[in-house]
């Protein structure tokens, strides 16, 4: 089984308000079921963490770099307040592959070139993910994705990691201002 280049941590979000809770925090629209690529920002619009969000029938899985899992859990718990949500780490293998998307797997939302992701057991070939990621200019947390940078500087728009039509989220005002100041009128 091929696994991502770096270990991944999984957070499970449950509760009746799970979608609305995360929708108000992250850069991408996660209102539909499936796999989404998104980020959490500071109120000043700077990068904190990028991750995948898998919206399922009864819960949401957050697939984040293993090194960011504790800080992301802490930050999300801080925002939880009275929301009817529970956030907890869970064990779930993350597998990736290329070629046709197998049953139970999801196309990588950043670009088709990165293949698919599956949560749970899934057979796949051994792949040099680092070479593939570099060839397709996909930034990696801890390498090219650095804290206190703006996500538009790190190409999140090209990677389908930000939705300019979804409405408010933490840091949205800064991101929108940067986007619209760089467009020709």
Region locations from a protein language model:
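Basic, glycine/lysine-rich polyanion-binding surfaces/domains
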Residues: 1-185
């Amino acid at each position: 089984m091929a696994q991502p280049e770096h270990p991944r941590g999984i957070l499970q979000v449950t509760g009746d308000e799970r979608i609305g809770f995360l929708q108000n925090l992250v850069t991408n629209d996660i209102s539909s079921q499936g796999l989404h690529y998104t980020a959490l920002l500071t109120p000043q619009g700077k990068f904190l963490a990028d991750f995948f969000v898998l919206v399922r029938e009864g819960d949401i899985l957050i697939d984040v770099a293993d090194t960011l899992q504790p800080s992301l859990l802490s930050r999300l718990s801080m925002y939880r307040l009275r929301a009817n949500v529970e956030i907890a780490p869970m064990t779930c293998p993350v597998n990736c592959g290329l070629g046709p998307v197998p049953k139970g797997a999801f196309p990588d939302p950043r670009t088709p070139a990165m293949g698919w992701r599956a949560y749970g057991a899934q057979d796949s070939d051994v792949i040099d993910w680092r070479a593939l990621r570099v060839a397709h200019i996909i930034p990696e947390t801890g390498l090219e994705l650095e804290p206190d940078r703006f996500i538009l500087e790190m190409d999140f728009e090209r990677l389908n990691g930000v939705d300019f039509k979804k409405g408010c989220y933490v840091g949205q005002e800064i991101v929108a201002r940067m986007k619209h100041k760089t467009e020709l009128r």
